[in-house]
């Protein structure tokens, strides 16, 4: 089965052949009055052969594309042993594969997959975006990494349209406030994966996290994976004693050292001033420490 890169490479070759044929036509046009019949015949043969080769190559690519489209519609998704091993090593690496082709991952602990309609803003207008939402559990034979993710709570993956204006690196606002704490390159992916946690994690011990990554063949669509549920809205407003860590190192006045409040002060400021979304947190005021 041809990959997207192979088809793109073949199309570049076809376009190169077409441009070469056009150059031959222009060359013949400029020297047409002076060419003898023998030379004219040779030039015409070369032009015809060039365009004929490009035509045949293009027909072959269209046949491959049509056959793969028909195969994907009629054939169920089959997981090879190599893909199963890859999913065990990095479960998030194969999520795009399942979301795109609608495969069932019941053997990996998935309980349900369903389609939902999301409204996404695209250049000032609204359009319907069909998103595949995957709710996952965990199997008894999962790896240690999968068991750790089970402890983080319910997992949900959704596809959302990327912003076309403003800071296009940020996913659309989902009515929660987030702090980015990491980013890494993923094997087999063109775009890095960003990691976010709830802004109120330190203050309210909120466990909600999410991962954001662009799709390989559609850079204008984000795959967002949510882990855990927000508990910060169920908590009461913090008091001065609860906002300050119990183990704050306080030195005497003569030492000249100040009190280190750390991230708790930053999170308290987020609550006091209110963050409007993922792009409006207090990172611009307070420096961000290394993620835990």
UniProtKB/Swiss-Prot annotation:
SUPFAM superfamilies: WRKY DNA-binding domain (SSF118290). It holds the Pfam family WRKY. Residues 133-155 are annotated as: Disordered. One of its GO terms (molecular function) is DNA-binding transcription factor activity. It is found in: Nucleus. One of its GO terms (cellular component) is nucleus. Residues 167-235 bind DNA. Keywords: DNA-binding, Nucleus, Transcription, Transcription regulation. SMART domains: WRKY (SM00774). GO terms for biological process: regulation of gene expression. Belongs to the WRKY group III family. Transcription factor. Interacts specifically with the W box (5'-(T)TGAC[CT]-3'), a frequently occurring elicitor-responsive cis-acting element. This is WRKY transcription factor 55. It comes from Arabidopsis thaliana. The gene is WRKY55.
């Amino acid at each position: 089965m041809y990959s997207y890169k192979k088809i793109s490479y073949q199309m570049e070759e076809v376009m190169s052949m077409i441009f070469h044929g056009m150059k031959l036509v222009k060359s013949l046009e400029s020297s047409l009055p002076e060419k003898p019949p023998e030379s004219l015949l040779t030039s015409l043969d070369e032009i015809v052969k060039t365009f004929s080769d490009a035509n045949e190559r293009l027909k072959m690519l269209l046949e491959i594309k049509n056959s793969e489209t028909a195969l994907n519609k009629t054939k169920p998704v089959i997981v090879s042993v190599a893909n199963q091993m890859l999913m065990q090593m990095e479960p998030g690496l194969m999520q795009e594969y399942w979301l795109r082709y609608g495969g069932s991952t019941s053997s990996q602990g998935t309980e349900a997959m369903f389609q939902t309609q999301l409204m996404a803003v695209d250049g000032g207008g609204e359009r319907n975006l069909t998103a595949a939402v995957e709710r996952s559990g965990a199997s008894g034979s999962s790896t240690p990494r999968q068991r750790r993710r089970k402890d983080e709570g319910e997992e949900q993956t959704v596809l959302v349209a990327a912003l076309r204006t403003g800071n296009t690196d940020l996913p659309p606002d989902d009515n929660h406030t987030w702090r980015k704490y990491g980013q890494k390159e993923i094997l087999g992916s063109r775009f890095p994966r960003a990691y976010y946690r709830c802004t109120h994690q330190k203050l309210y011990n909120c466990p909600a996290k999410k991962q954001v990554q662009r799709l390989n063949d559609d850079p204008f669509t984000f795959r967002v994976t949510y882990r855990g549920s927000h508990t910060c809205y169920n908590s009461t407003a913090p008091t001065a004693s609860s906002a300050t860590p119990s183990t704050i190192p306080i030195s005497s006045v003569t030492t000249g050292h100040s009190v280190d409040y750390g991230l708790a002060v930053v999170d308290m400021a987020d609550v006091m001033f209110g963050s409007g979304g993922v792009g409006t947190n207090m990172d611009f005021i307070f420096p961000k420490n290394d993620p835990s």
